[in-house]
Amino acid sequence: MGLDLYAYKVKNLESYNKYLSSCHNYNNYSAFLWTKYEKEVNKAYNRYCNWEAEHQNDPDYSLKENPYSYGINNFITEEEKNNENELATYREFAKTNCNYHEIESLYMRKHYWFIQYLYHKYDDKMIYRDGDIVKTFSGEQFIITKTDLKDIIDRLQRVIDASKNNLDTYYNDPLVYHSLSDEPLVNKDVMDREFPIYNEYHFAARMDWNYSYTTINSYLNDFKNVYSEMKDEELLVYVESW
């Protein structure tokens, strides 16, 4: 389970799949080049490190330039370089064509309730391997349609609606003491029902920010704003990062 989830918007599934395909082709070719020239690169890297070790105590070390370079471009042929550049150019074209851009307001940092929703949505494409949850679909990215987004909004709205009493008690009850680090929480039972834990082993240590009223309500409004401007064929793409 990643710590961060980055949200992107794309114009439709067809153009997005072409972008994924272009990324796949570029990555495969880069991996092929690395496998082919791995020994040469490692030897060059060792020469680079040896020179650094020999000269780092020289009085004029900061003025010297290491004569050795270990970049793979020093070894690939001109044809291979052109092939890689062509694949990189097509990848960037496909990215532009699908209008792949980040939606910063929907970035998630350790918001386990949302990753749980995504894991449940893709349950048939998740497997357990070596004690971890592994995605088996192309690109390892979660696709959210406009219909899915409406479902998320409805779930969050039910959580907020069920939490009004919590908010009233928090601000209006004179007998309730709050430290500076306190904040109002949503109704935990409703939150856990709308965004159930995907697997107890992976989500046993749920953090308090899963239940922050302010945070949940803020994301609800952000999702609503994105939904109101979203075309039917557009998609949200969430990328999990470690």
Predicted segments, located by residue:
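Acidic (Asp/Glu-rich) sequence patches and key acidic residues
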Residues: 1-225, 229-232, 242
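Conserved GNAT acetyl-CoA-binding A-motif
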Residues: 234-237
